[in-house]
Structure formats: structure tokens, C-alpha cells
UniProtKB/Swiss-Prot annotation:
The lineage of its organism: Eukaryota, Metazoa, Chordata, Craniata, Vertebrata. This is Interleukin-12 receptor subunit beta-1. The gene is IL12RB1. Pfam families: fn3. Keywords: Disease variant, Disulfide bond, Glycoprotein, Membrane, Receptor, Repeat, Signal, Transmembrane, Transmembrane helix. Belongs to the type I cytokine receptor family. Type 2 subfamily. Residues 626-637 have a biased composition (Basic and acidic residues). It comes from Homo sapiens (Human).
Length: 662
């Protein structure tokens, strides 16, 4: 048994050695058939982007990318020499392989390289690369800081050339948040500093990557892509923010608050997160419109730092900027705080000028006194800056001016604001001391009420009206009206205060028939006004209405009685002076009995018995319609009366006709 073992073991060892010699070494390119079917499956996935280059004097490297699932994938680097012989390197699951110039691959002559991947029982091939390995140097992408600037509406990128790699061909690719990669060419580079001109977008951010390869070697491999270069849009996005201002505090300051944050810029995938170069900086620029005589009117702050402001008027601008410069601004106007304190400011007007007194804030305070006519544009405001001053013993600060200066010399209403600051050079340290109204010029004379009128109100009162004083147009200046009434007989004077909003008062307790004079003046808190022109009036003595009624009634009854008596007297006189005449038809004297007989007489001698008697004819008249008549009056014919000729025939029908007429 031992002799058999002695012979078998050496033979087995020799057999293994012979088999190892026949097998391909891992460090060499194997010139045998590959251990897989050599046929491209045409799959869309597989190895891509093969690059082969020299990394040292005798060392070379090939690398590639694989797209698709990597589990169970084996990679083989294939190489065909110019003679037509082909070999392969087994790389396993790695995508990078190194070999020396002794691996059986010609490095001084042109060779063709590609990658075959065996996966899922199929073969996937990469595109072929033909090159001379010794001259194919591995170029690095742009390293370090890539400077980005704007040149003639284009984007210019500049970087330092990697060491020992002068002379390169450079490409770039770029994309936006909503677009895929786009390839561009930078052209040949042959200097220690390389640059590239790229398109610049106006309103969207871009991501750029650069790669390099040896100039003049078309078969050489490209370097890997550089790190992302994030470029902001040419125009920074305009901020859409909103501010609010709090109420003015006791310290004369109010807080400016940002209500809405600016919108964030949309970035491509490779620039999301901390992407230097795409930052948009928002700054807050304050412009204090009030107190134009101060040394500094503007200040720029970071948007995140909200300042405290005085009660002055401001323009607040939000400035957006990126590495290309500032963009469009958005400006808001913050109006001045109009809260007034009419009792906080004392004004003394004298022959030498005017002096203001107000409560001092602190030691060494600089005050800015600003005034402007009410109703005018704020740009017409005038101001005066005082030197730093300490409070007087009464704790007051003062400011004086002469009449020659013309300050507030016109007779009109002025709005006065006083600001204070211990550091006037710092715009955000101003505070409002007070705001009030003041009537300039000769307020006593200018405020005198005009058009004073007096109207009767009752038997012992009158209503006094007047036009509003000019002081009433100045809020808080007019304290009250005073109406003075003077009794011209007793020389007694009474004064009546009236609210500044009223222009009418009723004076009562007056006596009829007495002369009075009335005057009106307008007073301020620090000055008495001038009396208006006196208006004279009196209340007439009034007669009782009942007395007038009874007097009128007596007159009426007297006239009525006289009329009745006169009428009766005239009636009686008319009966005596003008008695009524008889009515023939109403008298029975003309009625004759016996039918239609005619009586004629011409001369009394025809009736001797009548003529001798010489009796008077008596005619009786009856007022009744019946046969009975009563004599009312008797008329006697005197002697010597003319003869009565009765040549009329009266019949019964004629008598009836007369009765009918009656």
C-alpha cells in the first residue's frame, strides 16, 4: 500500500502543475475562449462608459459603469490586438481593473477594448474603445474652486488646470429642475487656466458638471464628471413678503415684523441641500423719511433681523441678490405714527422768539425737531438738529428760535414731531419723544372768531352764533371759546366758556329794553385769544297776547254796535223823510161795482150837488188782497185842484189784472 501511495502522490502533483500551467493567470490577458457564450443579447442595460488609461509608467487601468441589477453579474474586459488576436481579463463583480505592460496587451500600438458582462444567462456588451494605452493618460476633471461669473449674457466658468495635464478637451453638461442633462463643448484648452462659456438662464437655477480628456487623442477616455457646479438664475427671485408694524410703545419705538418668509428657489437634483453658488441673499434696507437733516438716512440689515423703529415714516425695501448681483427690489411704505400728545409740549411765545419745552429722555441726547404745514406733502418737512443736551433742573429739554428765522412764522397749523437718539449715526436707534400740533404766527389774532350774529331765542334769551376759528383746524390747539356779554346800563359783564367743537351758545336771563354787547374769543392751552368786534343788541318789550286779544275784541264790538245803531237811525229817518207812495193796483179805491160802466166828468159843474158841497176827495188804500180794506193814510185834495178826467174803462177783468200784478 505504501509503495502505491508513493507513486500516486507525485503523479497527482505533476498533473496539477500541468493543469495550472495550462490555465490563464489573473494578472495576464487570457488568449482563450471566454467561459460564456460570446453573443450580445442586445439588452438596454449593461456596461457603459468604458475608460482605459495609463496611471503610471508601467501600470494601466480600465473602469466602467454598469446599469442594471448587479447581483450575480460577472464582468470581462475584452481586448483585441492589431494582429487580430483577442484576449480577456476576468474582473468578477468589480467595475475597475488594473494591469501592467507585461499582461500581454500591447501598450505602444493601437488596441480595441470593450466590456462583456454575463448576467442572467445572457451576455451584455459595452461600446468599443480604440486607443493607444501608453499615450492615453488619465485626465482629472476640474478640481478645486470653479469660479463662476457673467460675461456678455453668458455664464463663464474658470478653474486651475490639474498638474501635468496642460492641453485638454473639455465638455460640460447642464440641467434645470425640470429638464434632463444637455451636453455642451467648451473647446480645446492649452493653458494653466482653463475656462468655459455656458448658457445662462434668466429665471431658473442650473446644475453644471465638467469633464476633461487629453487634447488630440480622439480615442482617449474622458475623465469622470466633476462635482456639481450650481448656478443661480441671472435675475434673483423677487421676494414676496409682508410686513406689519406694532403700536408705538412707551419708549417711542415700534417693532417691525415679517409676516411671510421669501419663497425658496427651486434647485436641480444635484444642488439640493447645501449647494454653494445658488444662495439668494435677502437684505432689508431702511430709509427714514422723517427728520431729513440727520446725518444718515439709510441702513441695510439682514432680513432675519427685524429692527425696532421710531414713529417716523419709513420706506422699507427688500433687496434680493446672488453671485451675479442684486435683483429687483420690492418696497413698502410705513407711514408715520400720528398719535399726538397735546399736553406734552409747552410753547412760550415772546418778543425775542419762541421756545419749546418737553420732557427730556436722558443725558447727552440729540433731538431732531421736525415741523411741516398740515395738509402738505411730507417731503416739504423742515427740521432742526440740536446738539447733545442734558435735561435742565426741571427735567425738560428746550429748543428756541427767533422770529427772524421764519420758523413756523406763517399763520397756519403745523404738525410737530420730536425724535431723540443717543447715537444719531445709527438709524435704528432713533425714538419718538412726542408728536403734536402747533398754530404758527400770531395765533391770538388769527384765531379770533368772525361773523358773530345774535338772534332772539325767547323773551329773556338770545342765541349767539359765530364762524369757527382758524385754530379749530389745528387738532388739540383750540382749548375753548369764551363768550362775553356786557350790560350797557349796569356795566355788568358775564363770560361763558364754550366747547371747542361748538359755535353757538344761548344767553339767558336778559332783560327787555336793555342794550347789550356780545364778543367771542378763542383760547389755546397757553395763550388767550383776541375778542371779536362787539355786537350790540337788545330785546324789545313784549305786550301780553291776552291784552292784545281783548283790545282787539273791544274794538270789534264797538264798531259792530256803532254800525247797528247807525243802521237803525237811518232807517227811522228814512220813514219820516221819504214816506212810501201808494200802489194803484193794491188800492180798493179804484174798484167800481156794477160791471163795465163808463164815468166821465170834466167839470164840477156837471155835478151841481157835488160842486156845491166842495168836499174833499178821500182815497182809502188797502194792503190786503181780500175785499176788506183798512185805511192807512188819507189824502185830501185841496180846493182849486184841477179837474180829474177819468177816461178809463175799468172792468172786473181789469181789476183782477191789477190784483194779479200785486
Amino acid at each position: 500500500m505504501e509503495p502505491l501511495v508513493t507513486w500516486v502522490v507525485p503523479l497527482l502533483f505533476l498533473f496539477l502543475l500541468s493543469r495550472q500551467g495550462a490555465a490563464c493567470r489573473t494578472s495576464e490577458c487570457c488568449f482563450q475562449d471566454p467561459p460564456y457564450p460570446d453573443a450580445d443579447s442586445g439588452s438596454a442595460s449593461g456596461p457603459r462608459d468604458l475608460r482605459c488609461y495609463r496611471i503610471s509608467s508601467d501600470r494601466y487601468e480600465c473602469s466602467w459603469q454598469y446599469e442594471g441589477p448587479t447581483a450575480g453579474v460577472s464582468h470581462f474586459l475584452r481586448c483585441c490586438l492589431s494582429s487580430g488576436r483577442c484576449c480577456y481579463f476576468a474582473a468578477g463583480s468589480a467595475t475597475r481593473l488594473q494591469f501592467s505592460d507585461q499582461a500581454g496587451v500591447s501598450v505602444l500600438y493601437t488596441v480595441t477594448l470593450w466590456v462583456e458582462s454575463w448576467a442572467r444567462n445572457q451576455t451584455e456588451k459595452s461600446p468599443e474603445v480604440t486607443l493607444q494605452l501608453y499615450n492615453s493618460v488619465k485626465y482629472e476633471p476640474p478640481l478645486g474652486d470653479i469660479k463662476v461669473s457673467k460675461l456678455a449674457g453668458q455664464l463663464r466658468m474658470e478653474w486651475e488646470t490639474p498638474d501635468n495635464q496642460v492641453g485638454a478637451e473639455v465638455q460640460f453638461r447642464h440641467r434645470t429642475p425640470s429638464s434632463p442633462w444637455k451636453l455642451g463643448d467648451c473647446g480645446p484648452q492649452d493653458d494653466d487656466t482653463e475656462s468655459c462659456l455656458c448658457p445662462l438662464e434668466m429665471n431658473v437655477a442650473q446644475e453644471f458638471q465638467l469633464r476633461r480628456r487629453q487634447l488630440g487623442s480622439q480615442g482617449s477616455s474622458w475623465s469622470k464628471w466633476s462635482s456639481p457646479v450650481c448656478v443661480p438664475p441671472e435675475n434673483p427671485p423677487q421676494p414676496q413678503v409682508r410686513f406689519s408694524v406694532e403700536q408705538l410703545g412707551q419708549d417711542g419705538r415700534r417693532r417691525l415684523t415679517l409676516k411671510e418668509q421669501p419663497t425658496q428657489l427651486e434647485l436641480p437634483e444635484g444642488c439640493q441641500g447645501l449647494a454653494p453658488g445658488t444662495e439668494v441673499t435677502y437684505r432689508l434696507q431702511l430709509h427714514m423719511l422723517s427728520c431729513p437733516c440727520k446725518a444718515k438716512a439709510t441702513r441695510t440689515l439682514h432680513l432675519g433681523k427685524m429692527p425696532y423703529l421710531s414713529g417716523a415714516a419709513y420706506n422699507v425695501a427688500v433687496i434680493s441678490s446672488n453671485q451675479f448681483g442684486p435683483g429687483l427690489n420690492q418696497t413698502w411704505h410705513i407711514p408715520a405714527d400720528t398719535h399726538t400728545e397735546p399736553v406734552a409740549l409747552n410753547i412760550s411765545v415772546g418778543t425775542n422768539g419762541t421756545t419749546m419745552y418737553w420732557p427730556a429722555r436722558a443725558q447727552s441726547m440729540t433731538y431732531c425737531i421736525e415741523w411741516q404745514p398740515v395738509g402738505q406733502d411730507g417731503g416739504l418737512a423742515t427740521c432742526s438738529l440740536t446738539a447733545p443736551q442734558d435735561p435742565d433742573p426741571a427735567g425738560m429739554a428746550t429748543y428756541s428760535w427767533s422770529r427772524e428765522s421764519g420758523a413756523m412764522g406763517q399763520e397756519k397749523c403745523y404738525y410737530i414731531t420730536i425724535f431723540a437718539s443717543a447715537h444719531p449715526e445709527k438709524l435704528t436707534l432713533w425714538s419718538t419723544v412726542l408728536s403734536t400740533y402747533h398754530f404758527g404766527g400770531n395765533a391770538s389774532a388769527a384765531g379770533t372768531p368772525h361773523h358773530v350774529s345774535v338772534k332772539n331765542h325767547s323773551l329773556d334769551s338770545v342765541s349767539v352764533d359765530w364762524a369757527p376759528s382758524l385754530l379749530s383746524t389745528c387738532p388739540g390747539v383750540l382749548k375753548e371759546y369764551v363768550v362775553r356779554c356786557r350790560d350797557e346800563d349796569s356795566k355788568q359783564v358775564s363770560e361763558h366758556p364754550v366747547q371747542p367743537t361748538e359755535t353757538q351758545v344761548t344767553l339767558s336771563g336778559l332783560r327787555a329794553g336793555v342794550a347789550y354787547t356780545v364778543q367771542v374769543r378763542a383760547d389755546t392751552a397757553w395763550l388767550r385769544g383776541v375778542w371779536s368786534q362787539p355786537q350790540r343788541f337788545s330785546i324789545e318789550v313784549q305786550v301780553s297776547d291776552w291784552l292784545i286779544f281783548f283790545a282787539s275784541l273791544g274794538s270789534f264790538l264797538s264798531i259792530l254796535l256803532v254800525g247797528v245803531l247807525g243802521y237803525l237811525g237811518l232807517n227811522r229817518a228814512a220813514r219820516h223823510l221819504c214816506p212810501p207812495l201808494p200802489t194803484p193796483c193794491a188800492s180798493s179805491a179804484i174798484e167800481f161795482p156794477g160791471g163795465k160802466e163808463t164815468w166821465q166828468w170834466i167839470n164840477p159843474v156837471d155835478f151841481q150837488e157835488e160842486a156845491s158841497l166842495q168836499e174833499a176827495l178821500v182815497v182809502e188804500m188797502s194792503w190786503d188782497k181780500g175785499e176788506r180794506t183798512e185805511p192807512l193814510e188819507k189824502t185830501e185834495l185841496p180846493e182849486g185842484a184841477p179837474e180829474l178826467a177819468l177816461d178809463t174803462e175799468l172792468s172786473l177783468e181789469d181789476g183782477d189784472r191789477c190784483k194779479a200784478k200785486m
